């Protein structure tokens, strides 16, 4: 299994600079994809920022939202992870800790574009960067 965080999903949806590398890696592994329910809200927030910054238009927003809805990842509730999310509070935001806690609980690798997600926990982290 692979946990995708919001940075990776935004890269994939927007076909960002790292999207091809992420797709190649995912295709080579053929693992199932999992995400905390939080992912959808975080990605919608990122899409909103892209629109507010005039980097995309309303039509593109609709396309990205449809792509998010179609993301072939199983959504996991974060309620069972709350204790671990809290334990990680000294090094991570609750948002980041939700992805880490899910990866730890399932033994999945965590895919991210955020270097700060490395270390301070027991999850395996794969960081994509330019």
What is each model feature region?
Residues 1, 100-130:
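Acidic, PIN/NYN-like endoribonuclease modules and their adjacent C-terminal/linker elements
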Residues 1-38, 50-59, 115:
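Short, well-structured N-terminal submotif of metal-dependent ribonuclease cores
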Residues 13, 47, 121-122:
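Short, flexible helix/strand-to-coil boundary loops that buttress conserved ligand/catalytic motifs
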Residues 24-30, 66-67, 82-83:
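Glycine/charged-rich beta-loop-alpha catalytic/anionic-binding loops adjacent to active sites
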Residues 71-113:
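Active-site neighborhoods of divalent-metal-dependent phosphate/nucleic-acid chemistry enzymes
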């Amino acid at each position: 299994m692979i946990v995708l965080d919001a940075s990776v999903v935004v890269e994939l949806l927007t076909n960002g600079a790292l999207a091809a590398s992420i797709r190649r890696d995912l295709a080579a592994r053929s693992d199932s994809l999992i995400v905390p329910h939080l992912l959808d809200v975080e990605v919608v927030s990122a899409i909103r920022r892209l629109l507010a910054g005039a980097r995309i238009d309303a039509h593109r927003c609709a396309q990205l939202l449809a792509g998010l809805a179609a993301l072939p990842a199983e959504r996991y509730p974060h309620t069972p992870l709350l204790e671990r999310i809290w334990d990680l509070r000294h090094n991570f935001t609750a948002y980041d800790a939700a992805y880490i806690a899910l990866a730890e609980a399932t033994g999945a690798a965590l895919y991210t574009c955020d270097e700060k997600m490395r270390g301070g926990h027991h999850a395996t982290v794969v960081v994509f960067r330019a």
